[in-house]
Swiss-Prot record:
It comes from the Viruses. GO terms for cellular component: extracellular region; host cell nucleus; virion component. The lineage of its organism: Viruses, Viruses incertae sedis, Naldaviricetes, Lefavirales, Baculoviridae. Residues 38-96 form the Chitin-binding type-2 domain. Its main location: host cell. Keywords: Disulfide bond, Host nucleus, Virion. InterPro entries: Chitin-bd_dom (IPR002557), Chitin-bd_dom_sf (IPR036508). This is Protein AC150. It comes from Autographa californica nuclear polyhedrosis virus (AcMNPV).
Amino acid sequence: MLKPNMLIIIFIIVCLFSIIIFTVLKSKRGDDDESDDGFSCYNKPIGVNFPHPTRCDAFYMCVGLNQKLELICPEGFEFDPDVKNCVPISDYGCTANQN
C-alpha cells in the first residue's frame, strides 16, 4: 500500500502533467471559441466527435472547455455523423451528396 506522502507526490505529478498538456494544446490551437468554418465546442460534450461543417473526410473532437481537435479520416473514408466515426465512402454518404 502506498504511503500518504507517496500519494501526494503522485497527485502533484499528475496535476503538473495535466497542466503542461493543456498548455501545449492551447498554445498550438489558440483560443478556440469559433473557427473560420463556424464550428465551436461551446456547450458540447468532451470526447465526442462532430462532423466538420464543410469537409466530408474531417471531423472535430471537443477536448476541453471550448477546445477542439480537427481530425482527418484515412483516404477512402468519410465521417458518418450517425456512428460518429470514419466509415468507407459509400454511394449515399456525404461525399456522394457533394457531387
